[in-house]
Amino acid sequence: MAPVHVLCCVSVLLATFYLTPTESAGSLVSYTPNSCCYGFQQHPPPVQILKEWYPTSPACPKPGVILLTKRGRQICADPSKNWVRQLMQRLPAIA
């Protein structure tokens, strides 16, 4: 049986990857339009912290929008929500 600290580290890593938008190729840090969202932010973040956005890949199981903050954080949002569409109009899109 593996030591408890190893199991804890593995659990933390798995949770981190599950909650981060996934990339179909490349680094998690790069902002390529190949990411998928498996859960969505329920409430709008303050527009002051946001920088830009890009859509998820059409190959993803759910359509989504990834909002990028000025600090580099990625937030998954549901493009069918009114607040998300309003942010998409206000913020520049990544081509």
Swiss-Prot record:
The organism's superkingdom is given as Viruses
Entry annotated with the keyword Signal: yes
What name does the UniProt record give this protein?
A: Protein K6
An example GO biological process term is:
antimicrobial humoral immune response mediated by antimicrobial peptide
Pfam families to which the protein is assigned, alphabetical: IL8
Q: Which PANTHER family match?
A: C-C MOTIF CHEMOKINE 4-RELATED, SMALL INDUCIBLE CYTOKINE A
Q: Which InterPro entries match?
A: Chemokine_b/g/d (IPR039809), Chemokine_IL8-like_dom (IPR001811), Interleukin_8-like_sf (IPR036048)
Its taxonomic placement starts with: Viruses, Duplodnaviria, Heunggongvirae, Peploviricota, Herviviricetes
Q: Which organism is it from?
A: Human herpesvirus 8 type P (isolate GK18)
Instruction: List GO molecular-function terms, semicolon-separated.
Output: CCR chemokine receptor binding; chemokine activity
Example of a GO cellular component annotation carried by this entry: extracellular space
Annotated gene: K6
Keyword vocabulary terms for this entry: Signal
Task: Indicate the transmembrane segments per the record.
Answer: none
- For this UniProt entry, which residues form the secretion signal? 1-24
